[in-house]
């Protein structure tokens, strides 16, 4: 939820992490802002720029296959999905939102790799603009926190 109380995590340290980002180009004004906020937060958390790999795909439905290719390389400590799905007048919104989300979750479980899902689903452009920076930064924090957690649990 936008503006929700997300609690606080211990100090997040991304110094040793390798992060992969898949960004959809569809609604690029929003996804570029998501990516900028995400990358800025990763750097602030100590992730080295050279350890951040970012690729782009046409839209949200293509995000899972690129994430899968990254997961199969076994080079990344966490992955991040960035996209924006804005409701239109057809069922296509539900299809894209549900299938892209399910694909991201399935990959995280199948490959046992944290994937921060910042494919935002909104009713209109105004909602997307209001959420773009916060959700991009949130995705970076989730990726770093979960990568460190899974490392500690292994």
From Swiss-Prot:
One of its GO terms (cellular component) is cytosol. GO terms for biological process: riboflavin biosynthetic process. Gene3D superfamilies: Lumazine/riboflavin synthase (3.40.50.960). Pathway: Cofactor biosynthesis; riboflavin biosynthesis; riboflavin from 2-hydroxy-3-oxobutyl phosphate and 5-amino-6-(D-ribitylamino)uracil: step 1/2. It is an enzyme of class 2 (transferase). (2S)-2-hydroxy-3-oxobutyl phosphate binds at residues 89-90, 131. CDD domains: Lumazine_synthase-I (cd09209). 5-amino-6-(D-ribitylamino)uracil binds at residues 26, 60-62, 84-86, 117. GO terms for molecular function: 6,7-dimethyl-8-ribityllumazine synthase activity. It comes from the Bacteria. The active site is at residue 92. Belongs to the DMRL synthase family. This is 6,7-dimethyl-8-ribityllumazine synthase. It comes from Verminephrobacter eiseniae (strain EF01-2). The gene is ribH.
